[in-house]
Amino acid sequence: ASFIVMCDGKTVLPLATSQDHKRLLDADQGPNTGGMGAYSPAPVVTPEVHARAMREIILPTIKGMEKDGIPFTGFLYAGLMIDPQGHVKTLEFNCRMGDPETQPIMARLKTDLVDVLLAATAPHSETRFDDFELDWDRRTAIGVVLAAHGYPMSPRKGDVITGLPQDTDDVVVFHAGTHMQGGQVVTSGGRVLCVTALGGTLKLAQQQAYDTIQGIHFDGMQYRTDIGYRAISR
């Protein structure tokens, strides 16, 4: 699971949990990628696992950096391995948000992100994160990545993208590997778009995302059809 927090140098503000899908093909087959989709929240991160991750991994890391004279301000992303007993191990740290985990997280975040960033970087004399609370949409969000032909080895560029929908309150198409060329949107990287949708259940969010994808087209477009399957099968 992806465990992302915001830090102001002392205090930690956890973001919503998320789970991504690294393999290119359905059923976790094919080569590894930067991520072919994600959903939030991640049921595998139970309240007990969340508390353990904060207690055993996140807080000691932040306090350790402060003790070493390098207090950390910004996003800290911990890639976690969670066993069936709920024990948590850290696979990696990144000083950034995750892609595509961020897209469903942002879809659920009701608090203005600018307010969060300003609070994190406020002068030390001010409250900062001590009394800061994030407001989340209680619904589930899912993001499905549309990748270019040849991804992840040698993604093709320049394919014209058609059928891009207008964003709504429940569906947003995030651009990544796109470029304007001759008045048309074309592919310019491996992971091209991330179609993100909200739903009352993961199944409903999944259906909304895949229904939207049906209207989008570019030559060689590839995507997984099972994003969210882990949570649905739990």
What are these regions (language model features)?
Residues 32-35, 72-77, 84-87, 138-141, ...:
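A generic structural signal for well-ordered coil/turn residues at beta-strand boundaries
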Residues 178-182, 186-234:
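Generic C-terminus detector
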Residues 53-76, 94-170, 181:
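Active-site "cap" helix and flanking loop/linker of ATP-utilizing ligase/carboxylase catalytic domains
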Residues 25-27, 130-133, 178-185:
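Short beta-strand/turn micro-motifs at beta-sheet edges
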Residues 24, 36-39, 129, 161-164, ...:
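Short clusters of hydrophobic/aromatic residues that line enzyme substrate/ligand-binding pockets
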Residues 5-7, 146-148, 197-199:
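Short beta-strand-to-loop capping motifs
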Residues 34, 144, 205:
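Residue-level signal for inorganic ion chemistry
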Residues 1-106:
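Internal nucleotide-binding/catalytic subdomain
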